[in-house]
């Protein structure tokens, strides 16, 4: 236990020295100042949280973090703007946006590994583009672990494969959206969300105005479980959920 605490404390000190702020699990700390409003500070903070086994990264209120390059690649699934999430990490936002620069090469915003968890609170992810040959799912987020959105938004992301905003894949994968929106994303199929063999739960959330080349445009669901609680899937093209490999309970059109 003593060694674990030492490692986390040193990681926290490293992060603070870099001008960023991370709350590490299991260590008593005063709430730190927010991560500086720039790409480097955000990448350093996420890297430190991964190394510490998880943590909360507090973002500068109202800041748009613009990613100009990929900072994550597991060598299999193509590039991601943020370091691959390998531990439970919360991005604590306040009207924040994390976006790919329009002049940057194609990469999704985030990838969550099987051991990882990404929680977004009041954060928008936009501009991600999954285009790697054969690994082009999840323009906003590619998830193999756990993704939780609370009061957050996925918009303007593109996947050349499945899941323009979010692709969640594998029996261990879980995607939970509460009071969140998935809008104006594009993909080959499932321009809003693609969930394959995992658990998908939407509560008081909206999947709207997403456009796919092939049905369905809103939610692509294949096995696992899907639950819509007081949520709407509307105005997606060509369809909302029709032609999904498995029916999406409560989704019409």
Name each model feature, range by range.
Residues 94-97, 119-129, 148-158, 174-186, ...:
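Right-handed parallel beta-helix
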Residues 76-80, 103-111, 133-142, 159-169, ...:
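Extracellular beta-strand/beta-solenoid scaffold signature
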Residues 1-30:
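Secretory targeting and sorting signals
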């Amino acid at each position: 236990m003593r060694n674990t605490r030492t490692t986390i404390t040193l990681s926290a000190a490293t992060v603070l020295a870099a001008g960023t702020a991370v709350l590490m699990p299991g260590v008593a700390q005063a709430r730190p100042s927010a991560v500086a409003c720039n790409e480097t500070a955000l990448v350093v903070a996420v890297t430190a949280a991964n190394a510490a086994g998880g943590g909360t990264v507090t973002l500068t209120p109202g800041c748009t973090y613009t990613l100009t390059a990929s900072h994550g690649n597991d060598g299999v699934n193509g590039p991601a703007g943020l370091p691959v999430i390998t531990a439970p990490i919360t991005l604590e936002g306040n009207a924040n946006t994390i976006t790919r620069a329009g002049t940057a090469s194609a990469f999704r915003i985030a990838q969550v590994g099987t051991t990882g968890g990404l929680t977004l609170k009041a954060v928008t992810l936009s501009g991600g583009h999954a285009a790697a040959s054969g690994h082009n799912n999840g323009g906003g987020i590619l998830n193999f672990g756990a993704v939780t959105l609370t009061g957050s938004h996925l918009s303007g992301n593109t996947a050349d494969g499945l899941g323009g905003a979010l692709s969640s894949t594998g029996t261990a994968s879980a995607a939970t959206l509460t009071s969140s929106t998935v809008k104006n994303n594009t993909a080959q199929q499932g321009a809003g969300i693609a969930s394959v063999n995992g658990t998908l739960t939407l509560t008081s959330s909206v999947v709207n105005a997403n456009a796919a080349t092939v049905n369905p445009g809103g939610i692509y669901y294949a096995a696992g479980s899907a639950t819509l609680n007081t949520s709407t899937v509307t105005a997606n093209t060509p369809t909302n959920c029709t032609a999904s490999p498995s029916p999406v309970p409560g989704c019409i059109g």
